[in-house]
């Protein structure tokens, strides 16, 4: 909006990333980046200057910070599981700080959807839970939520409900670290970073081995697309007008995957006319006369050794590519 942003200090919870900065840099050096310059430059420079991660967000929808603090601020509890939370609630009831357990009926250890449908771990429920400190003082949850980027960074383990289920998937490295991920170059401060930080801090490991950092799709003048500037291209209108094939071919033939693309619909029209138009005319010519002559392809397949050098070369290139993809 180009409006000035007002900053003011708030109490927040941080992850002390700066203590592990050297480890973050060391693990990054083991990652195969495409292009390499993104890993060493943009992402590497970001790690070199990494600050502590502000985890607190003052919102309603999201994952609540599982932190309870006594009224005088002298005691803190961090809850690590539903099982622990239920135990703490029962203790709070015993101490007279709560009347009942809202998770009554939940079966600890039962990982079925039906069982988890019995509880709600979001803010409007969790904020009503009052725990007891070791000295029986009332403890209330921190009102903030967790940064949503922490959710995405925890994806490799959260998707398997680790460590409560499927521990072997992660501990035995069956599904972690990832062999390959891909995202836009802007994720050097987003998903690439949060995956990397959590993997390093929690598992002392990379979260991914190989990464392709895609370039951004810009307008035809090289400016970032924006509704405010009115230079955004509607992808659905583009696909309806030119079709998906011409659009795909234009995008993959005009820049490397890791370079930014200056997107111009006039270029799609040119691709459709010159490439797909020519291809269509060739096929139409063949189809017309093949049907007139009732052509049938019953010719015997020529053995590889009997083919010309150019045929053998292109077949070899194809099978080399197939092998490299399968072995990757």
Whereabouts are the PLM-identified features?
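Residue patterns forming the tRNA-binding/recognition surfaces of aminoacyl-tRNA synthetases
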Residues: 1-108, 121, 192, 223, ...
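Membrane-interfacial helix termini and the short, flexible loops that connect transmembrane helices
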Residues: 218, 257, 262-265, 297-304
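Short, glycine/acidic-rich hinge or "gate" loops at secondary-structure transitions
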Residues: 63, 208-211, 287-304
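Short, mixed-charge aromatic SLiMs
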Residues: 215-223, 274-275, 301-312
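Short, flexible helix-adjacent loops and helix caps
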Residues: 161-162, 259, 291, 295-298, ...
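Generic structural signal for alpha-helix starts
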Residues: 35-36, 177, 304, 308
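Alpha-helical recognition segments enriched in aromatics with Gly/Pro capping
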Residues: 59-61, 69, 88-92, 96, ...
């Amino acid at each position: 909006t180009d409006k000035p942003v007002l900053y003011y200090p708030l109490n927040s919870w941080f992850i002390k990333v700066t203590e592990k900065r050297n480890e973050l840099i060391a693990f990054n050096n083991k990652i195969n980046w495409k292009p390499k310059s993104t890993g060493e430059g943009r992402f590497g420079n970001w790690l070199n200057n990494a600050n502590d991660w502000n985890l607190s967000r003052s919102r309603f929808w999201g994952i609540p910070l599982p932190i309870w603090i006594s009224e005088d601020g002298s005691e803190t509890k961090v809850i690590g599981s539903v099982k622990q939370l239920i135990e703490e609630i029962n203790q709070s009831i015993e101490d007279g700080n709560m009347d009942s357990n809202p998770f009554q009926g939940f079966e600890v250890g039962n990982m079925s959807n039906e069982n988890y449908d019995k509880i709600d771990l979001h803010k409007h429920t969790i904020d009503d839970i009052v725990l007891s400190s070791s000295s029986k003082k009332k403890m209330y949850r921190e009102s903030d939520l967790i940064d949503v980027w922490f959710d995405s960074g925890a994806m490799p383990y959260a998707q398997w409900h680790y460590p409560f289920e499927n521990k072997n998937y992660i501990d035995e490295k069956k599904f972690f670290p990832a062999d390959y991920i891909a995202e836009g170059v802007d994720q050097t401060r987003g998903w690439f970073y949060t995956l990397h930080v959590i993997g390093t801090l929690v598992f002392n490991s990379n979260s991914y081995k190989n990464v392709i950092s895609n370039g951004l799709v810009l307008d035809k003048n090289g400016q970032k697309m924006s509704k405010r500037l009115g230079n955004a291209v509607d992808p659905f209108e583009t696909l309806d007008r030119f079709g998906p094939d011409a659009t795909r071919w234009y995008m993959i033939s005009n820049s490397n995957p890791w370079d930014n693309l200056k997107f111009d619909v006039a270029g799609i029209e040119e691709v459709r006319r010159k490439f797909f138009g020519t291809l269509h005319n060739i096929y139409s010519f063949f189809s017309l006369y093949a049907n007139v002559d009732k052509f049938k392809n019953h010719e015997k397949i020529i053995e590889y050794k009997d083919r010309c050098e150019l045929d053998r070369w292109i077949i070899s290139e194809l099978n080399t590519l197939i092998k490299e993809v399968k072995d990757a």
